[in-house]
C-alpha cells in the first residue's frame, strides 16, 4: 500500500466544516471531504484521509538547510510576509489499482511511477512510505465576452493603387471601407 500526496490551496473552498477525527471508519474517511474533483469517486481502492497539515513560515530564511523539509520554497516578495502551506493526504491502495486496464479517464491524473519506485524500501524505522503527486486539470477558463469586439477581415492581396487613393476624412463614429477593384 502506498500513499499519494495531493497538494491544494483551495481545498477549504471545496469542503464543509468537518471535524478532523482520525478515528473515523474507513467508510467515513471517504471523499465526502472533497466534493466534485476528487479521484476517490472514480478510482477503486482510494480513500481520503482527514489529515490537516498547515505550515506557516516567514519569507526570510536564515539557512537554506532549514527549507529542506518543506515541499516548496516561498515566494520572497517582502521579507515581512508570512506564507501558509496546507497539505492534504490521500491514501491509495495500489494493489487494487494495479494490474487492471485503465478505463476511467480520471485515472490518467496519476503520475507514472517506475517499477523501482513501487518497491517499499526497508530502513531502520521500518517500511518507508513513498509519495506521488496527483495532478488534476485546472477548470476551463470562460471565454472572453465578444459583445463589443469586432474583427476586420481584409483580402489577402492588395493592389498598389488601393493604398495611393486619397481617403476622405471621417468622424470618429463613421468608417469608410474601400475595396480594391
Swiss-Prot record:
Compartment(s) where it occurs, according to its Swiss-Prot or TrEMBL record: Cytoplasm; Cell membrane
InterPro entries: GC_assoc_lym
One MF term in the entry's GO annotations: protein kinase binding
Bias kind Basic and acidic residues: ranges: 117-128
Main location group: cytoplasm
UniProt keyword annotation of Cell membrane present: yes
Phosphotyrosine: residues carrying this PTM: 150
A single BP term in Gene Ontology: negative regulation of lymphocyte migration
GO cellular component, one term: plasma membrane
Keywords on record: Cell membrane, Cytoplasm, Membrane, Phosphoprotein, Ubl conjugation
Modification after translation: Phosphorylation on tyrosine residues can be induced by IL6. Phosphorylation is mediated by LYN.
Location of region: Disordered: 117-181
Modified residues (Phosphoserine): 102
Superkingdom in the source lineage: Eukaryota
Keyword Membrane: yes
Tissue: Highly expressed in normal germinal center (GC) B-cells. Expressed in spleen and, to a lesser extent, bone marrow.
Pfam families: HGAL (PF15666)
Note: GCSAM transgenic mice develop B-cell lymphoid hyperplasia, hypergammaglobulinemia and systemic reactive amyloid A (AA) amyloidosis strating from 12 months of age.
Subunit structure: Interacts with ACTB and MYH2; the interaction with MYH2 is increased by IL6-induced phosphorylation. Interacts (via C-terminus) with ARHGEF11 (via DH domain). Interacts with ARHGEF12. Interacts with SYK; the interaction increases after B-cell receptor stimulation, resulting in enhanced SYK autophosphorylation and activity.
Known function: Involved in the negative regulation of lymphocyte motility. It mediates the migration-inhibitory effects of IL6. Serves as a positive regulator of the RhoA signaling pathway. Enhancement of RhoA activation results in inhibition of lymphocyte and lymphoma cell motility by activation of its downstream effector ROCK. Is a regulator of B-cell receptor signaling, that acts through SYK kinase activation.
Protein name according to UniProt: Germinal center-associated signaling and motility protein
Natural source organism: Mus musculus
Upper taxonomic lineage: Eukaryota, Metazoa, Chordata, Craniata, Vertebrata
Gene that encodes it: Gcsam
Amino acid at each position: 500500500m502506498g500513499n499519494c500526496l495531493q497538494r491544494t490551496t483551495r481545498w477549504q473552498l471545496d469542503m464543509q466544516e468537518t471535524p478532523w477525527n482520525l478515528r473515523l471508519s474507513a467508510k467515513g474517511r471517504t471523499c465526502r471531504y472533497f466534493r466534485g474533483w476528487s479521484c476517490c469517486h472514480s478510482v477503486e481502492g482510494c480513500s481520503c484521509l482527514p489529515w490537516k497539515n498547515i505550515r506557516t513560515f516567514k519569507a526570510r530564511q536564515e539557512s537554506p538547510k532549514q527549507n529542506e523539509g518543506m515541499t516548496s520554497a516561498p515566494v520572497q516578495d517582502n521579507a515581512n510576509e508570512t506564507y501558509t502551506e496546507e497539505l492534504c493526504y490521500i491514501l491509495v491502495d495500489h494493489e487494487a489499482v494495479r494490474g487492471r486496464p485503465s478505463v476511467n479517464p480520471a485515472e490518467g491524473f496519476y503520475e507514472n511511477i517506475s517499477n523501482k519506485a513501487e518497491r517499499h524500501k526497508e530502513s531502520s524505522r521500518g517500511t518507508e512510505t513513498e509519495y506521488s503527486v496527483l495532478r488534476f486539470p485546472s477548470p476551463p477558463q470562460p471565454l472572453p465576452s465578444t459583445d463589443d469586439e469586432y474583427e476586420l477581415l481584409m483580402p489577402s492581396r492588395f493592389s498598389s493603387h488601393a493604398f495611393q487613393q486619397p481617403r476622405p476624412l471621417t468622424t470618429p463614429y463613421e468608417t469608410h471601407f474601400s475595396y480594391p477593384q
